[in-house]
């Protein structure tokens, strides 16, 4: 796992703590429906699971329910207006990316978040990624390997030369299927699963620890 040439990152729960603004949108819908707000601690594990996971948490519904589509659009409208109010990079991410840039290591972002949210958020956070792949950039989303392979191709690095850092089982599944070194961001959201059972080659408790996998 030594000597990898490029780094790819998930966004929500890996580079950025987006749960506060996602939670704001969810709680706005709950208050409108006469429900109590949920705590950030209860929202955080679902923050990597997109609208489906958040609406499932907040309202107990899924895409098969009649009310889902309308709530989804309302959620996205609220979130779009509050995209980076309280979202921040995790401690250590700025330092990691600065060191990666200093070493001349190419890096990018591969997220399932739609590009209409991803690009403004990346810009607001001041992230200068060499490639950004969103949930609608390719035919498939993670856990399919296509988005990661697309990003590696854009960087001009073979998949075997890339490390991918993510905080969800789908990140591990996608990166392993792509032939990349898969590392879990143990400081991230992690969902409801046991990260130790995902099959990744390693895990880190602080972003700067990723440097040991890179040239």
Where are these regions (language model features)?
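Short beta-strand-loop/turn "lid" adjacent to the catalytic site in phosphate-handling enzymes
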Residues: 106
């Amino acid at each position: 796992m030594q000597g990898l040439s490029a780094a790819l990152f998930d966004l929500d729960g890996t580079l950025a703590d987006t749960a506060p603004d996602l939670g704001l949108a969810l709680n706005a819908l709950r208050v409108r429906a006469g429900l109590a707000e949920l705590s950030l601690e209860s929202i955080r594990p679902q923050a990597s699971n997109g609208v489906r996971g958040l609406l499932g948490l907040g309202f107990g519904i899924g895409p098969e329910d009649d009310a889902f589509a309308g709530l989804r659009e309302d959620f996205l409208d609220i979130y779009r207006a509050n995209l980076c109010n309280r979202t921040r990079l995790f401690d250590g991410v700025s330092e990691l990316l600065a060191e990666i840039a200093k070493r001349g290591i190419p890096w990018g972002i591969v997220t399932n978040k739609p590009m209409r949210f991803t690009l403004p958020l990346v810009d607001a956070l001041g992230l200068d990624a060499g490639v950004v792949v969103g949930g609608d950039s390719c035919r498939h989303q993670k856990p399919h390997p296509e988005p990661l392979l697309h990003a590696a191709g854009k960087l001009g690095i073979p998949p075997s030369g890339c490390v991918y850092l993510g905080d969800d089982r789908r990140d591990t599944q996608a990166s392993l299927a792509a032939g990349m070194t898969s590392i879990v961001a143990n400081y991230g959201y992690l969902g409801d699963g046991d990260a130790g059972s995902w099959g990744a080659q390693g895990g880190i408790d602080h972003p700067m620890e990723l440097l040991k996998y890179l040239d």
